[in-house]
Design a protein with these regions (language model features):
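Structural alpha-beta junctions
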Residues: 1, 19, 149-156
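C-terminal accessory "lid"/substrate-recognition subdomains
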Residues: 3-10, 14-18, 22-126
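Short loop/turn motifs enriched for small/polar and acidic residues
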Residues: 60, 131-133, 159
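A structural signal for short, well-ordered beta-strand segments and their strand-loop junctions
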Residues: 75, 129, 155-158
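Catalytic cysteine-centered active loop of the rhodanese-like fold, especially the PTP/DSP P-loop
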Residues: 117-149
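Cysteine-dependent PTP/DSP-like catalytic domain, specifically the C-terminal lobe
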Residues: 144, 152-168
Length: 168
């Protein structure tokens, strides 16, 4: 399976605007996150998203070793986010609210999550993979966001994460 890139080059991470329906003057991160989450896609091609879908999500880091064979694979290696400079990124992982919020606050988040959900709904995979460089922040964060906001019945297995390796 050829991986689907979440972003194609590092410049896509630097776009300075959000969805047209979001007030560009909002500076509070929580308010901005709330506005973004209100715009999460609920349909694909006019059909409701099957949030009861059962499948497995795997995450891994390509620098930590091989991943696993999946029906769909999403590449987050060039996806970058910004977090508060006072936070120690080494003490965080994709389970951390700060990491998940940084993904949600990415300027292309709505476009990317819509593409992921559309692909899952179209292909109906049994297994989905997310990988990044180390399998700790981005891939884990994306998998946890997919479980939290869309596919609550998935089983998530983090192949490189030291904490909560498998979640039902």
């Amino acid at each position: 399976m050829k991986p689907i890139k979440l972003v194609y080059d590092k410049y896509e991470n630097d776009l300075g605007f959000y969805h047209e329906d979001i007030d560009s003057t909002i500076e509070d991160r929580e308010t901005l996150k709330g506005e973004i989450l209100k715009l999460l896609p609920e349909t694909v091609s006019g059909n409701a998203i099957n949030k009861d879908r059962h499948f497995k999500i795997f995450t891994w880091g390509i620098k930590k070793g091989p991943g696993t064979d999946c029906d769909l694979i999403f590449d987050a290696t060039t996806f970058q986010t910004k977090i508060d400079s006072e936070l120690d990124v080494h003490s965080l992982n994709g389970f951390s609210e700060e990491i998940q919020d940084s993904i949600i606050l990415h300027p292309k988040f709505l476009e990317i999550i819509e593409r992921i959900v559309n692909t899952i709904e179209e292909k109906k995979p049994r297994t989905v993979g997310f990988y990044c460089n180390h399998g700790k922040h981005r891939s884990v964060g994306w998998a946890e966001i997919m479980k939290k906001y869309y596919y609550k019945n998935t089983t998530v297995k983090h192949l490189c994460s030291p904490r909560k390796n498998t979640r039902q």
